Amino acid sequence: MKNYKKYSGEELINLDEKGNAIEKDKEEKKNKFNFKYKIIIPIIFFILIIVCYYISFHYKKNIKNVFDETTIKNLKLKNRVFLGPITHNIEKIEKIVKNNISLVVTDGAFVGDFSISNLQPEKPFRIDDDKYIKEIKELADVVHKYNSYILLDLFHPGLMTADKPIYSPSADKSFFNKNLKSKAMTKEDILRMEDYFVQAAKRAKKAGYDGIEIHGAHLTLVSSFSSIKYNRRTDEYGGNDENRSKFIVEIVKKIKQAVGDDMIISAKIDSVDEEYGFTENGFLTLGKALEKSGVDLIEVSGANPVRKDKGPYFFNDTKKLADILNIPIVCIGGIKSYEQADYILKNSNIEYVSLSRELLKDPDIIKKWYLNK
């Protein structure tokens, strides 16, 4: 069928061979369809690219292996396994690091106003005076001999104290001696304690440590500032989650200023535990505040690290924190097998796992994991 055109008024009208007008809307529909096709297809294609990129990025991010080589700041780690804070005994640590542990976090070293803590069954580990630099350096040298790295855990027991002096954010009884009661720390007490942590970090640097960890878990002094149960202050260090984070944030900032950017700064914090006053909002707020303050690493533990239930104890909360932060997060607590470590890494944004008791019991466990993986 041939088409003819006839000029009618202001427009050309398509005619068939008998002179009848062809329906104008057919051509208009075709034009509209072509127009929509040209617009919609590129949009759909663009959306598919974004979705595929997101899936690919997320998938690659979680394809992590226990034995990946990684980097934190200037440290090139040989795998994703740490030794957590459980001992400062040189012989015990050497047995562990010679079997390929990438990073060691020491047992808690007292930073100042020394007092006995029931948390340490071994000889108290001290960093509250320059005379201890030589002693702690021996441990760092042993770890470095095996191409591993070491962080010094900086610690004050707070209410975990069996004798005086005793410090806490609010007046409370000692956990180990009910006849002992602390007074609420004054602003001067807080600033002095912050300086103890700073001086301890400077000593760690002189001793050749690769970094420090601020021990803010297990209801120690720093930990108790984050608890709504033990921190009942109404000043700038209490009253809301941001204020309760201030003590450890100030410590981080002052340490960074004192030791520079070449040292790793890690923070160990409590997961959610309503019984001890650690709320979910407080936990996440603290994590964000620490990231903003400049920490390189966060390790998540709990107010009560000794559990009877099957581990990993703190995985769910650690996973939540890893989902909202852009710094490496470490999962610790009850990790006993390669399968558990592998599951944690592949099913979250958690970057590292830390073992303590299992490595003390079996220093060869990482070598066995590697051979049997």
Placement of each model-derived feature along the sequence:
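N-terminal Sec-pathway targeting helices
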Residues: 32-45
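Flavin-dependent oxidoreductase catalytic cores
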Residues: 19, 25, 53-373
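Sec-dependent N-terminal signal peptides of Gram-positive bacterial secreted proteins and lipoproteins
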Residues: 45-52
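Terminal low-complexity, poorly structured segments
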Residues: 8-11, 44, 286
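N-terminal targeting leaders characterized by basic, low-complexity, disordered sequences
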Residues: 1-26
